């Protein structure tokens, strides 16, 4: 009798466990899925620019942006110029904003780059971002840069940049800097 009671209890326990899994699966299926238009959670802020993002930026645009960093590292200002639009808005890490023609921007950057004997960039990562409602493409980068000046001074910093790309060219560039030392 004890064996039968034990077996019945064990069977009921196993069935009860399986039933909960079924209930959990059906409860999960009844929950509405989050959509791009409706956030899954009640957030304390509403994005003023956009909260609708995808990674729908071409690999060619990504390569072009990363090549501009390689051109800076190698001192290839003419190569860097090819990745920039006719007019570029630049938000510098100093807080200054400049709007310059491609030629004037290259003059500014040539002066800076010519003061250095070497530049080394350790590209930590990047993200392709496409604002689906604004229809704008961005490549965001995170990297460390080590600059050796011709005076012998060595400077290093961590950077976070935002590159807005339109028609295969960078039209807006914002740079944020944190010195390493």
Residue ranges and their predicted role:
Residues 96-97, 146-156:
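Short, cysteine-centered beta-strand-loop-beta hairpins and adjacent loop/turn segments enriched
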Residues 21-22, 156-181:
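Short beta-strand edge/turn micro-motifs at domain boundaries
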Residues 135-145:
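A short hydrophobic beta-strand element
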Residues 13-16:
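C-terminal motif of bacterial Sec signal peptides marking the signal peptidase cleavage site
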């Amino acid at each position: 009798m004890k064996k039968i009671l034990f077996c019945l209890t064990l069977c009921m326990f196993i069935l009860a466990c399986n039933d909960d899994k079924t209930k959990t699966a059906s409860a999960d299926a009844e929950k509405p899925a989050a959509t791009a238009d409706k956030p899954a959670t009640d957030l304390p802020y509403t994005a003023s620019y956009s909260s609708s993002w995808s990674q729908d930026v071409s690999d060619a645009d990504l390569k072009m942006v990363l090549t501009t960093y390689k051109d800076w590292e190698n001192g290839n200002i003419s190569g860097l110029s090819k990745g920039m639009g006719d007019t570029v808005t630049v938000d510098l890490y100093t807080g200054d904003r400049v709007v310059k023609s491609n030629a004037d921007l290259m003059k500014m950057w040539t002066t800076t780059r010519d003061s250095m004997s070497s530049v080394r960039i350790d590209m930590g990562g990047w993200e392709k971002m496409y604002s689906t409602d604004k229809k704008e493409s961005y490549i965001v980068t995170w990297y460390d840069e080590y600059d050796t000046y011709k005076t012998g001074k060595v400077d290093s910093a961590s950077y976070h940049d935002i590159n807005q790309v339109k028609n295969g060219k960078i039209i807006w560039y914002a740079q944020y800097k944190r010195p390493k030392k």
